[in-house]
Each structure stands twice: as C-alpha cells, then as structure tokens.
Design a protein with these regions (language model features):
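Short Lys/Arg-enriched helix C-cap and helix-to-coil transition segments
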Residues: 82-96
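Non-catalytic, well-ordered alpha-helical scaffold segments
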Residues: 7, 38-39, 69-72
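Residue-level preference for well-ordered alpha-helical positions
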Residues: 14-15, 45, 56, 60
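General nucleic-acid-binding
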Residues: 1-11
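Short, Lys/Arg-enriched anionic-surface-contact patches
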Residues: 11-37, 66
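Short, amphipathic alpha-helical "recognition" segments used to contact nucleic acids or chromatin
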Residues: 33-50
Length: 96
C-alpha cells in the first residue's frame, strides 16, 4: 500500500513538472526539481500519510540517498507557504 501511494504521487509530480524519473532522482540543486521533490515529500507525508522513514527508504530504493532532516525541511518548506498555495498544488494534481 505504501509503495502504491509513493508511486502515485511520484508520477503525478513528474507529469505536472514535466521532468523525467531520472531527473527527479538525480542529485541536483536545479530549482524546479528541488521544488518538485519538496512538494512530493509534503504530499506523501500529509496527504498519503507516509512516515518520513518510509519516504527516506523508498527514495533510497530509487537510488536517491536523502536524510530525514532533508525530507523534514522539504515538508516544512511547503507547510510554511500560504494555504491557498497548498490547495493549488492539490488542485493542479487533481487530488482535491
């Protein structure tokens, strides 16, 4: 079940941002990809109810080694935005 949630949000994000799976899991500081990952972490955690440790493990399964603190930072980055931005994210991904 957790993997299904992870995959669902992964494909929603890469399709919305028009990036490849390889780019999503590539170590880069490209603003668009970093923002996509932050939104992905936020969705998995808040909407998908995945634990941070599960997100970290599944990211690692795809070859992207990330620490708990980086996932928490990404989640907090989106949490600190205005509520209408969060709603816009969900609407644009057809999750509302």
């Amino acid at each position: 079940m957790q993997r299904k949630v992870f995959i669902k949000y992964l494909f929603n994000i890469i399709n919305s941002f028009n990036i490849s799976v390889d780019d999503f899991f590539k170590k880069t500081k490209d603003r668009e990809i970093v923002e996509a990952r932050h939104i992905f972490y936020w969705l998995c955690y808040n909407d998908g109810k995945l634990k941070i440790s599960v997100i970290v493990r599944m990211m690692k399964d795809y070859g992207y080694n990330i620490g708990h603190s980086s996932v928490i930072y990404g989640i907090n980055t989106i949490d600190e935005t205005e509520d209408n931005y969060q709603l816009t994210i969900k609407e644009s991904l057809c999750l509302v």
